[in-house]
Curated annotation (Swiss-Prot):
This is Eclosion hormone. It comes from Bombyx mori (Silk moth). It comes from the Eukaryota. The keyword Disulfide bond applies. It is found in: Secreted. One of its GO terms (cellular component) is extracellular region. InterPro entries: Eclosion. It holds the Pfam family Eclosion.
Amino acid sequence: MANKLTAVIVVALAVAFMVNLDYANCSPAIASSYDAMEICIENCAQCKKMFGPWFEGSLCAESCIKARGKDIPECESFASISPFLNKL
């Protein structure tokens, strides 16, 4: 009888836990500390991979260091990466 009661409690707790997973909305970057300069430089590297020789990755990284990560480039936003694009 005790085993059945324990099994029912475990199943009920598992169901309650799974139901509450949907309500847990948090961003890992906000839940833990993050370094804006690190994200900025990583985005520069990602844009360099995407655009290849048309993107000045070193210039982008230098601007991250000078601005201390305040202006993070987004590869899909032309306005944020236009200073780092070249015509070849």
